[in-house]
Amino acid sequence: MLEDYYPSTTSYYHSGIDDDLYTAKWGMVMTFLDLNDSSLTPFEGTHFALIGFKSDKGVYINNGRVGAVESPAAIRTQLAKFPWHLGNQVMVYDVGNIDGPNRSLEQLQNSLSKAIKRMCDLNLKPIVLGGGHETAYGHYLGLRQSLSSSDDLAVINMDAHFDLRPYDQTGPNSGTGFRQMFDDAVADKRLFKYFVLGIQEHNNNLFLFDFVAKSKGIQFLTGQDIYQMGHQKVCRAIDRFLEGQERVYLTIDMDCFSVGAAPGVSAIQSLGVDPNLAVLVLQHIAASGKLVGFDVVEVSPPHDIDNHTANLAATFIFYLVQIMAQHN
């Protein structure tokens, strides 16, 4: 039995007015799945599993605005409204949430990793609804556990922050996940391949830039780089990063986008990547056929305005699933 795991029991979705797939919405098509069901066998074809990570403990430790614990429900509600374009050949299963208000951050990350591995063993592509960006380390661990020790796993993070902070004194938090991944790779004598899109210089100290400069395998583009380059040059940079890689894990921190597009986040951003450009870049990553899982994190519904941020997060999920279904 998976720890801290709660299958969905309350529907966030609606039945709609008919059963015609040409007019169906996500909320009419998505079905519940219990990962603890021992009778399940690996699925054939390309299918997805949606799981919520109900934790913003890392945000609290990092002195951010808490509220991301409420985001899985908010994103599900927005996603349910979107039209379904994938017929009956592709399924998106809602498998529930990882939740443990009295559990430690490390325990919840470990529980998420085991749920992710279970999804991968069932041949389901994980989609995680954070939660703070501490979500990423648990997701990454689960993906790595589903691979052999020699398999590669590159990481792309769309984020205004590197999230490479040391954690020896403070302990893990929402800003340390990728340093934890880096340290794991060093311990295993692997190269940690990490590409951050949307870095803002005013959100990252000199220590972090120096760490990146000295670390082979880590690349980044600032938000201003992306603005000047345009999506085609950004996509070419991603292609170079992924050359020779077989698998990539993608994580989207909603503070990558300006407060006008994403007001409901843990750390608001005055500047940010254009969401339209982001969709083109995300579609390109998905079209590589290398994407094995992704998450959307740091949506904070108590600070949102008319569900703008939750809707944008759901929009990214919509377009990623559309393309992944065609290229996996």
Curated annotation (Swiss-Prot):
GO terms for molecular function: agmatinase activity; formimidoylglutamase activity; manganese ion binding. Mn(2+) 2 binds at residues 159, 161, 253, 255. Pathway: Amino-acid degradation; L-histidine degradation into L-glutamate; L-glutamate from N-formimidoyl-L-glutamate (hydrolase route): step 1/1. InterPro entries: HutG, Ureohydrolase, Ureohydrolase_dom_sf. It is an enzyme of class 3 (hydrolase). Its cofactor is Mn(2+). Its EC number is 3.5.3.8. Mn(2+) 1 binds at residues 133, 159, 163, 253. It catalyses: N-formimidoyl-L-glutamate + H2O = formamide + L-glutamate. It comes from the Bacteria. The keyword Hydrolase applies. The keyword Hydrolase applies. Binds 2 manganese ions per subunit. One of its GO terms (biological process) is putrescine biosynthetic process from arginine, via agmatine. Keywords: Histidine metabolism, Hydrolase, Manganese, Metal-binding. Belongs to the arginase family. This is Formimidoylglutamase. It comes from Streptococcus pyogenes serotype M3 (strain ATCC BAA-595 / MGAS315). The lineage of its organism: Bacteria, Bacillati, Bacillota, Bacilli, Lactobacillales.
